[in-house]
Design a protein with these regions (language model features):
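PRPP-associated nucleotide enzymes
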Residues: 1-175
Length: 175
């Protein structure tokens, strides 16, 4: 089965929206330091660009949580692959994610991080698929709401491919 990619959000659209989110976070946390927690691998492209656009002090940490196999649907099974290196105690934490889909993974992750005692905990996602939501998740900063299509680019992959695309594209499968 071959696939092709159709552009959903251009590089320019994505870049402009990330700038706006960076400005919003800078205003919301003015006078404070924010601790960004990147959910790897997909969130890395978004977090790197976002961090450059935040004008207040920022610290970074990374974790890897898996709920996808080689398929196009979330498996619903959450596994922590890499945990954080730093404590979240008393920090203003923003979890940076590439996409919110069913909400299962992030619900689990946010509950786990909440138990670590941050001063505040918010979620920032580049993409949100509200039509796929199974578990309610409070997203504080959203880049784009998108339809229920399988997307790649800007860190999102299909079977480890297409992460490097500078735009968000829809995978279209040839039958």
């Amino acid at each position: 089965m071959a696939e092709s990619i159709r552009v959903l959000l251009s590089e320019e659209e994505v870049d402009k929206r990330i700038q706006e989110i960076g400005e919003e976070i800078s205003r919301d946390y003015a006078g404070r330091k924010v601790h960004l927690v990147c959910v790897l691998k997909g969130g890395s492209f978004f977090m790197c660009e976002l961090a450059k656009r935040i004008t207040i002090p920022v610290s970074l940490d990374f974790m890897s949580v898996s709920s996808y196999g080689g398929d196009t649907k979330s498996s619903g099974v959450v596994k922590i692959v890499k945990d954080l290196d730093e404590s979240l105690k008393d920090k203003d934490v923003i979890v940076v994610e590439d996409i919110v889909d069913s909400g299962r993974t992030l619900s689990y992750l946010l509950e786990m991080l909440r138990d670590r005692g941050p001063a505040s905990l918010r979620l920032c996602t580049l993409l949100d698929k509200p039509d796929r939501r199974v578990v309610d998740v409070d997203v504080h900063y959203t880049g784009f709401q998108i339809p229920d299509e399988f997307v790649v680019g800007y860190g999102l992959d299909y079977d480890q491919m297409y992460r490097n695309l500078p735009y968000i594209g829809v995978v279209e499968f040839d039958n």
